[in-house]
């Protein structure tokens, strides 16, 4: 605690920037301190597309804060454990992933949810459309950064005009695997390196 991200200040330049920015991406830890929490709430008001990468790491989260942020969110990303934890917090029994996602969509009026499933791939829900994709098989060298790279790959296509769910998810699972196959959370690589890897590892949607 008491590090730089606990004391992020609201700046008019940042609020102005968000009016022309494609997305605001944030996690839970950024709101553990009152100063940064207030700033985050102001930023979400200025942003048109809020992406919440949920991190339920005790003791650095508050369920009331999580709910408040989800009400401001257009796209939320959970892992399997976080999905079940969220349902427990809300007194909802787990039935299936699809039922759980639809429940959260309804409660928070949020169309898009991603569930990362580790070695079993990832599920993307956009409204009533569900897309399950496998992981790309690689020799794992470092899993640090794989979740962030998955989301970065997802957004790089999601925010492009004219892309479809297959292109979005292929980019996401490919970039996650590409980073996992290298040492370090932020390995050096070129766009050509990744594009070649992605195009050599084609994937297809899985049955739900």
For the regions a language model picked out, list residue spans one by one.
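A generic local structural motif
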Residues: 9-13, 37-40, 61-65, 98-102, ...
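Active-site donor-binding loop signature of nucleotide-sugar glycosyltransferases
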Residues: 1-2, 78, 135, 191
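Conserved phosphate-binding/catalytic loop of the ribokinase/pfkB sugar-kinase fold
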Residues: 1-38
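Structural motif
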Residues: 13-16, 42, 65-68, 103-105, ...
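Conserved beta-alpha-beta core of the PfkB/ribokinase-like small-molecule kinase fold
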Residues: 23, 27-98, 121
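Conserved phosphate-binding/catalytic region of the ribokinase-like
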Residues: 90, 94-208
């Amino acid at each position: 605690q008491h590090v730089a991200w606990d004391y992020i200040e609201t700046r008019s330049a940042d609020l102005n920037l968000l009016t022309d920015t494609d997305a605001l991406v944030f996690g839970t830890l950024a709101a553990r301190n009152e100063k940064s929490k207030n700033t985050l709430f102001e930023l979400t008001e200025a942003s048109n597309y809020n992406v919440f990468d949920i991190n339920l790491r005790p003791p650095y989260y508050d369920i009331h804060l999580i709910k408040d942020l989800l009400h401001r969110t257009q796209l939320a990303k959970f892992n399997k454990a976080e999905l079940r934890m969220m349902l427990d917090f809300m007194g909802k029994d787990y039935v299936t992933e699809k039922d759980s996602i639809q429940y959260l969509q309804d409660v928070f009026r949020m169309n898009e949810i991603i569930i990362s499933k580790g070695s079993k791939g990832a599920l993307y829900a956009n409204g009533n459309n569900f897309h399950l994709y496998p992981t790309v098989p690689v020799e794992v060298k470092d899993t640090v950064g794989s979740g962030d790279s998955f989301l970065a790959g997802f957004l790089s296509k999601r925010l492009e005009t004219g892309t479809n769910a297959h292109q979005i998810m292929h980019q996401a699972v490919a970039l996650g695997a590409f980073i996992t196959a290298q040492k370090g959370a932020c390995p050096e690589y070129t766009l050509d390196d990744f594009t070649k890897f992605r195009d050599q590892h084609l994937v297809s949607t899985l049955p739900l």
